[in-house]
């Protein structure tokens, strides 16, 4: 027979007795009790006590309280999470509303600024127009007709006092305007006379129709501007005259220095070539500029001419040597007169002095 070699292996460990009908030390007394009473695994009977051992599992009270607390906390946590999600959704919705409101606020602030600027410009234009009309009313005085007779009403009693008070003020203003017109006319006449005497080519300041220009009473700024313009014109004229004088003085000094340099070069040539010195000296004209008149004049001075004429009258028969001596004396005298220091008027002592003429060696 085929018998399992290990039948003990399949025996129930929960049975109360083993194969030898001995109570097992690992058996379940509750299970065995149920089995003995005809219950089994699906038995739904109430708690049964086998001796002093209770059939239900023993659970401590602390564990039960802890489990209840944990369940309550979990439930509360879920509720709080739901509330948090709803609040977050509300925050997102409010953020979108804030963004739209911010855009509208920026738009309306820009519109407000634009409207304020337009209003300010309009008010400024109105103020300017009012000021212009007030000025016209101030300077164009139209007499008003008053048909109300004095003493008929309290209003008529108040009007003469106003007129009496306004008359002296108007008289003072008119006097001041007349004085101002006279002063401006005097200043303009004086300036025009000064400008005409200083330079005739420049146009004098406009003095025609001073009453029309100053009919409204010129301000201090207008007077100062006019005076500054006239002073500037005078300064420009003075500067141009000074510049011309300086250029003229420089040209004269340059001419003198060039003439002196030319004489020095002539002296050097005379020293180098003594044979041709007399011929070159006779051919060269060293007379200073502007010494000749419009008509042709002789190349010798009056003293030499008188000397020559007296000598010719006394001695008619001169030889060639005497003629050469006279000509040498004439040219030597002309050269010494030209080498004298020129007399130039020096108005400014700080100008460059004239160079000294060098004596020929």
UniProtKB/Swiss-Prot annotation:
Biased composition (Low complexity): 193-208, 311-328
Domain of life of the source: Eukaryota
Predominant cellular place of this UniProt entry's protein: nucleus
Ranges for region Disordered: 1-24, 189-219, 308-361
Compositional bias of kind Polar residues: 12-24
Gene3D superfamilies for the chain: Geminin coiled-coil domain
Swiss-Prot/TrEMBL GO biological process terms: spindle pole body duplication
Keyword Nucleotide-binding: no
Family annotation (Pfam families): Spc42p (PF11544)
GO molecular function annotation: structural constituent of cytoskeleton
The UniProt record lists the keyword Phosphoprotein: no
GO CC terms in record: central plaque of spindle pole body; cytoplasm; intermediate layer of spindle pole body; nucleus
Keywords: Coiled coil, Cytoplasm, Cytoskeleton, Nucleus
Name under which the protein is recorded: Spindle pole body component SPC42
């Amino acid at each position: 027979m085929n018998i399992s070699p290990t039948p003990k292996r399949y025996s129930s460990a929960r049975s109360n007795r083993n194969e030898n009908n001995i109570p097992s030390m690992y058996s379940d007394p509750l299970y065995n009790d149920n089995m003995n009473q005809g219950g089994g695994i699906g038995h739904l009977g109430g708690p049964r006590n086998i001796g002093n051992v209770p059939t239900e599992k023993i659970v401590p009270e602390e564990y039960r309280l802890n489990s209840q607390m944990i369940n309550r906390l979990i439930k509360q946590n879920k509720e709080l999470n739901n509330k948090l999600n709803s609040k977050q959704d509300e925050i997102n919705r409010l953020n979108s509303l804030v963004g739209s409101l911010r855009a509208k606020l920026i738009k309306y602030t820009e519109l407000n600024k634009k409207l304020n600027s337009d209003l300010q410009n309009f008010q400024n234009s109105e103020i300017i127009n009012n000021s212009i009309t007030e000025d016209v009313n101030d300077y164009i005085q139209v007499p008003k007709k008053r048909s109300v007779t004095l003493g008929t009403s309290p209003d008529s009693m108040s009007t003469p006092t106003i007129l009496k008070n306004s008359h002296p003020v108007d008289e003072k203003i008119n006097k001041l305007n007349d004085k101002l017109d006279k002063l401006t006319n005097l200043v303009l006449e004086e300036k025009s006379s000064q400008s005409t005497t200083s330079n005739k080519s420049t146009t004098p300041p406009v003095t025609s129709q001073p009453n029309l220009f100053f009919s409204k009473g010129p301000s201090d700024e207008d007077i100062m501007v006019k005076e500054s313009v006239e002073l500037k014109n005078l300064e420009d004229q003075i500067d141009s005259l000074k510049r011309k004088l300086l250029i003229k003085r420089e040209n004269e000094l340059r001419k003198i220095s060039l003439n002196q340099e030319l004489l020095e070069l002539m002296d050097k040539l005379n020293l180098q070539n003594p044979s041709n010195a007399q011929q070159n000296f006779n051919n060269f004209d060293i007379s200073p500029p502007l010494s000749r008149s419009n008509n042709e004049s002789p190349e010798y001075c009056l003293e030499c001419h008188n000397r020559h004429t007296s000598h010719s009258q006394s001695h008619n028969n001169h030889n060639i040597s005497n003629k050469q001596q006279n000509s040498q004396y004439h040219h030597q005298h002309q050269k010494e007169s030209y080498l004298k220091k020129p007399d130039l008027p020096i108005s400014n002592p700080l100008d460059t002095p004239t160079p000294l003429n060098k004596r020929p060696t």
